């Protein structure tokens, strides 16, 4: 997701709460070794109206990596050569381009990446085959509806837009939202892949904040990210972060147990 404020891309183990290392067998029956981490998932920017496909893969050092969709069509083929090929790669993350719904409708997007079992195959430096199977779901969590100190999220953060409605508040600042319980309700948006909406299980929430500051005459973007368990629906912004200025942008992201994630963006100004 190319956020309007260049969101921190959080692919850390903390964000995903990964426990695959302890849940996968050491060696499969056919001597193929599974990747220690293997995830393919969707990310929806509900504010901008765009979808992208992401993957996070980690394991033994490899020189070749391929991904096949449920129809056995190859969607990724990476071969490492030269000195890097001799060194090998381990952790690998990608995110696709994310055209707006005007350019690529969500219906076409989900047809392009069907739900089902995706095979991730690789070749280790010593020639050993690596393989994992992952499930990709079209179930997207409904967008969070955040409040800043009890005030509904601003819908338009561009000062030049006639609908500019930035939230004006004072410290301390608490961002809260109701628990996300269902999948996306919009059949022409993030819910295009699954209708009617179904119940979801939230894996975690994430709040990202950003402010542009001037440091010795140069503009600098300060960011912070906070990850909460599924029962956490409230964050008090650290006073040290708020002390940097007055105009802040923020994002609240809901990550489902299938790792699909839906984010909304907004803003607030301190009095």
Regions found by a protein language model. Give the residues of each.
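Surface-exposed, short loops/turns at beta-strand junctions within beta-sandwich domains
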Residues: 108-115, 239-246
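Bacterial N-terminal signal peptides
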Residues: 11-22
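Conserved aromatic anchor
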Residues: 55, 166-199
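Recognizes extended acidic, P/S/T-rich segments that occur
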Residues: 72-104, 188-243
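Extracellular fibronectin type III
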Residues: 130-133, 255-271
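Proline/serine/threonine-rich low-complexity linkers at boundaries of modular beta-sandwich domains
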Residues: 132-153
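Long, polar/Ser/Thr-enriched low-complexity segments
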Residues: 28-107, 115, 119
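Beta-strand-rich modules
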Residues: 124, 240-262
């Amino acid at each position: 997701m190319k956020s309007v404020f260049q969101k921190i891309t959080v692919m850390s183990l903390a964000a995903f709460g990964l426990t695959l290392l302890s849940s996968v067998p050491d060696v499969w029956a056919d001597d193929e070794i599974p990747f220690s981490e293997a995830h393919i998932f969707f990310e929806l920017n509900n504010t901008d109206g765009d979808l992208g496909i992401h993957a996070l893969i980690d394991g033994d050092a490899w020189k070749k990596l391929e991904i096949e969709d449920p129809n056995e069509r190859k969607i990724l083929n990476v071969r490492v050569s030269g000195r890097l090929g001799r060194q090998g790669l381990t952790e690998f993350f990608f995110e696709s381009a994310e055209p707006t719904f005007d350019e690529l409708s969500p219906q076409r997007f989900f047809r392009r990446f069907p739900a089902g079992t995706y095979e991730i195959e690789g070749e280790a430096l010593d020639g050993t085959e690596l393989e994992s199977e992952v499930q990709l779901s079209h179930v997207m969590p409904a967008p969070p509806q955040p409040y800043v100190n009890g005030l509904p999220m601003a819908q338009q953060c561009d000062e030049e837009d006639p609908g500019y409605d930035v939230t004006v508040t004072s410290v301390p600042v608490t961002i809260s939202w109701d628990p996300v319980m269902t999948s996306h309700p919009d059949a022409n948006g993030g819910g295009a892949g699954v209708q009617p909406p179904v119940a979801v299980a939230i894996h975690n929430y994430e709040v990202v904040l950003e402010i542009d500051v001037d440091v010795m005459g140069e503009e600098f973007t300060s960011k912070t990210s906070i990850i909460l368990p599924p029962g956490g629906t409230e964050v008090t912004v650290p006073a040290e972060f708020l002390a940097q200025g007055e105009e802040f942008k923020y994002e609240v992201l809901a990550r489902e147990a299938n790792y699909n994630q839906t984010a909304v963006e907004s803003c607030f100004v301190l009095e």
